[in-house]
Amino acid sequence: TVKAYLAKDALGEYAIPAIRQRPILLMGPPGIGKTQVMEQVARECGVALVAYTITHHTRQSAVGLPFIRQRNYGGKDVSVTEYTMSEIIASIYAKMEATGLSEGILFIDEINCVSETLAPTMLQFLQCKTFGNQAVPAGWVIVAAGNPPEYNKSVRDFDIVTLDRVRRMDIE
């Protein structure tokens, strides 16, 4: 699936446009090697890999920190809240600069164990490929991983709408 998402046509455009690429969801017991599988896939495809265990993150590190900026709307000065770049998105750009690779895999582990405050952000991420107002760069495939509920009591079940937006692969 990663190779298919990264394949380009004769004009150099992605054969499957990013908007049609559903994130891949790997489900399997802890310690089975989901992260190692993604490391191998990245090596074989010749792309970068940025891996995050999302349970170690807060909403602020995922969407960015808020700051106040002065704007003028309709001749009236107002204060508006904007956000810094997401730590996760910034890591993708840092990896691109460090490796010289413009394509890669963003691997988010333990996605179904996120805190209640981060769950809506993860749903937006899976649906829109964004963290806050920043999109995952073109050429980056989203892969998430999780554990079935029988292996982890803090697992949140994905609703049918979310499952419809991912390409689930069970690993045993």
Regions of interest found by a model, annotated:
Residues T1-E172:
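AAA+ P-loop NTPase catalytic core and its hallmark functional loops
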